[in-house]
Each structure stands twice: as structure tokens, then as C-alpha cells.
Amino acid sequence: MSEKIVVCLEKGGARDMAEAFSRRTNTTISEKPGEHLTVLFNSKGVSLTGYGLAYQGDFENMLHRVTNGRLQHEMLVRASKSEKPGRKAIDATAGMGEDGFLLAAQGYEVTLYEQNPVIAVLLKDALRRAKKHPILKEIAARMKLTEGNSVELMPALLDPVDVIYLDPMFPARQKSSLINKKLQLIQKLEPPCSQETDLFDAAISAKPDRK
């Protein structure tokens, strides 16, 4: 991570998740948020706060993209369309899991790779809450998070996959734009991707049907 973070556990927060994250990142748990980046565990889940911004993963925001016939209009869904039963996909640069969610909504069993521990714990919490949602739970059940570097993990895959999706984070061009506020916050802790070639080579080595 490119910036030091504070781990804050408030009343009602998931202590087991906070303690596991604290061990993973070699940080101590505080009762108060930090001045800059804070991973906050409270009764609402896990969020990233700092610099006057706050972000929490929430797949409910994706509902309008997968209901009322809208899913089939998504470019990713059209590109990965398949009638094969038991199809599997990898989202090698999961981020907050939006693209993996679209693949899972299409029926794929999706493995999400995320190497940044902060983004991974935000995604883990978002999936945990989605699995309790009456509509989202069926989609979320097809999504599995693996924390680690996909460049290192994909060449060791034993089971064949049908789709490998790559969407590395690139520098934001309009850092003052409201649409990039989430990206601004995340880029405080993870710089833009610098492994594009390695990522593509690792995906090729896994021999998917599509990539």
C-alpha cells in the first residue's frame, strides 16, 4: 500500500474481520478514525474514509443493471455470452467486484482476485451483505473472493476456465470530477496498474476459452 492506514473498530463492527485485517496489514486497532485513510468497521459494515470522502462497497447499486432485462445490454455480458453449463470465469483485477457481479448475474461461477488488502476487505464485506439480500444473494453465491496477486496465481490454476476478465486500474484523467471520487480514495492506497504485460501473459498461460 502506498499510504499508511488506520484501522478503527466501532460499536457493532465485526471484530473478527477487524482483527484478521489488522494482522494481515500489521496495524493496530484504534477506537477513533485517523486523520487520513481509515478502514472503519462498524454496525453498517466496512468502509474506507479519509480526505473528506467515504466509500463502502454496495452491490445494491448494481441492481438496476441486472434487472428488468437490462443485463443483456451490458457490453461485458454480450462479449462473454455462453450457453455452456457450469461455466467459470476469473476477474483477475476485481477491485470492488462490479464486473465480476455482472458475470455472476449471467450465470458464471466467478473467482475474484484482489491483491490489495484494503480493497479486498471492502469487497469481502460487500459480498457478505449481498449474500443476505433477497435479490442479490443468488448472484453473490456464485462469487468467490481470493486475496492475492492474479499474476502469480493464474499460472497455477488446475481447473479450466471459460473467461478471464482484465480491467487494471489506470490513472484518473479528471481527478476533480465527482465521478472519480471513489477512484481518488482508492488511488491513495493503491497506485495505478504497472503490470499490464505480466497480467496479460498470466491470463494467456491459464488458457481460457475467452480473455
List each language-model region with its residue ranges.
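Conserved proline-anchored active-site loop of SAM-dependent methyltransferases
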Residues: 89-102, 161-180
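Mobile active-site "lid"/loop adjacent to the S-adenosyl-L-methionine
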Residues: 168-201
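Short, well-ordered alpha-helices that flank and scaffold nucleotide-derived cofactor binding pockets
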Residues: 101, 105, 125-129, 205
